[in-house]
């Protein structure tokens, strides 16, 4: 019997029925497979990162790798709870510090219980935040509990008291002990998943009673996300709707990321470095730099050239700001050939360097082609590809909707509440 060479088409087709796809010799399902030169090829597996003995706390939302000027390789990881640096096989916690307080006898222990109450006036902490206690000695033991450690805050009692949990029970009971202690608070953790908001301002004025949660909502509270980039050899990290921080590579892995300072915007959706012109962009940021209440989801700022601290425009610098008109908020951005591509939830825009006095200008490149999530776009050799709310798109000078044989399979089972967690 004559043998026939069966040639199958690359990719997976979930738009047609298995019977119809089979007629055209198309695959209808796959797992751990990629297509190379038109043929399926297995993934070659993965390994632990960094290793099984080290724990990454939280859900990783963004990663970024780079090489320092002295040749060291780094990988930054941003989770909903921490910010890390991986160098070699070692993982370092570089989560920024929110506040440092000097306390006196703040600990109250209960015999045979691992729960400790900490007193700190106007602590400003939330459940899930991390705090580290030090007292200048090798160890600070009270009733068998070693307090010179990092702890997760498990309960907020009130504005002046919270609770932490040790790994074992206290051997005694003390009301107000520990001596002179320094409490170092890391920045407030973010939510691990997106949820709907049901509080004040969700529905129309006067609906329901004061202090009562609303029964429905169209307001989404996004999960914590990060944007990570390089300014030279240093790391720039922005927490979604939070602050922007710098980790100085030359200071070493024993140091933490720090705020850009009092002159930088206090809240932004994300950041991006223009590698060609050496400006730092902050998108969805504050119209008044020091006031988080003025955060505008369509407004963006760029720093002076070669500066992370100069944000106020003057006649002698290149700092400035612009506002995008189409859409309700800026979702994401990537650097491309000769421009920065910026997406709102409705449209695509190009930002180009135009020189003095305006520094940068913008023009709209497409409408009804918004981005679904912060990390759902990529640029490859000047061509951009992204996932929208209803389809996949590309831009090569013109916005095009991409044909996709798995489109219904993807979108029919999509949780739009958690769409900002998507990464492509």
Indicate where each model-derived feature is located.
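N-terminal beta-propeller domains
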Residues: 1-100, 187-214, 268-350
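Small/polar beta-strand repeat architecture
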Residues: 1-4, 9-10, 15, 94-225, ...
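Surface loop/turn motifs at the tips and blade-to-blade linkers of beta-strand repeat domains
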Residues: 53-57, 260-264, 323-325, 364-369
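Repeated scaffold domains used in trafficking and secretory/extracellular systems
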Residues: 58-65, 221-227, 264-274, 329-332, ...
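Active-site-adjacent structural elements in enzyme catalytic domains
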Residues: 230-231, 240, 251-252, 264-266, ...
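Hydrophobic or amphipathic alpha-helical targeting/insertion segments
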Residues: 234-246
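Surface-exposed loop/turn elements that mediate protein-protein interactions on large endomembrane-trafficking
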Residues: 247-255, 292-319, 352-359, 394-406
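Beta-sheet-dominated scaffold domains
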Residues: 327-424
């Amino acid at each position: 019997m004559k043998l026939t060479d069966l040639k199958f088409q690359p990719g997976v087709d979930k738009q047609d029925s298995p019977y119809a796809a089979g007629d055209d010799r198309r695959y209808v399902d796959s797992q751990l497979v990629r297509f190379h030169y038109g043929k399926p090829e297995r993934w070659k597996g993965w390994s632990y990162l960094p290793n099984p003995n080290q724990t990454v706390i939280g859900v990783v939302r963004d990663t970024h790798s780079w090489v320092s000027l002295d040749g060291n390789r780094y990988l930054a990881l941003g989770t909903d709870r921490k910010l890390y640096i991986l160098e070699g096989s070692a993982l370092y916690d570089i989560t920024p510090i929110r506040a440092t307080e000097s306390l006196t006898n703040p600990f109250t222990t209960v015999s045979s219980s691992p729960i400790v109450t900490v007193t700190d006036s106007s602590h400003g902490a939330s459940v899930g935040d991390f705090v580290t206690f030090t007292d200048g000695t090798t160890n600070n033991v009270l009733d068998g509990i070693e307090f010179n450690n990092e702890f997760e805050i498990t309960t907020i009692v009130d504005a002046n008291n919270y609770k932490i949990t040790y790994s074992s029970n206290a051997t005694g009971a003390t009301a107000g002990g520990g001596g002179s202690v320094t409490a170092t608070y890391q920045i407030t953790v973010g939510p691990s998943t997106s949820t709907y908001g049901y509080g004040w301002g969700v529905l129309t004025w006067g609906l329901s009673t004061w202090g009562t949660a609303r029964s429905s909502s169209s307001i989404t509270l996004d999960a914590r996300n990060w944007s990570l980039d390089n300014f030279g050899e240093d790391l720039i990290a922005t927490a979604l709707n939070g602050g922007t921080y710098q980790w100085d590579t030359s200071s070493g892995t024993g140091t933490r990321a720090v705020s850009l300072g009092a002159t930088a915007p206090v809240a932004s959706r994300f950041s991006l470095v223009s590698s060609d012109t050496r400006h730092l962009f902050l998108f969805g940021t504050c119209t008044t730099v020091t006031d988080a209440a003025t955060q505008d989801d369509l407004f963006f700022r760029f720093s002076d050239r070669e500066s992370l601290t100069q944000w106020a425009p003057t006649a002698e610098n290149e700092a400035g700001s612009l506002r995008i008109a189409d859409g309700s908020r800026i979702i994401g951005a990537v650097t491309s050939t000769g421009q920065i591509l910026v997406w709102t939830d409705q449209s695509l825009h190009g930002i180009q360097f135009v020189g003095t006095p305006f520094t940068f200008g913008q023009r709209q490149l497409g409408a009804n082609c918004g981005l679904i999530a912060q990390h759902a776009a990529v640029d490859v050799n000047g061509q951009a590809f992204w996932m929208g709310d209803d389809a996949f798109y590309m831009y090569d000078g013109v916005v095009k909707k991409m044909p996709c044989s798995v489109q219904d399979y993807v979108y029919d089972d999509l949780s739009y509440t958690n769409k900002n967690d998507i990464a492509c």
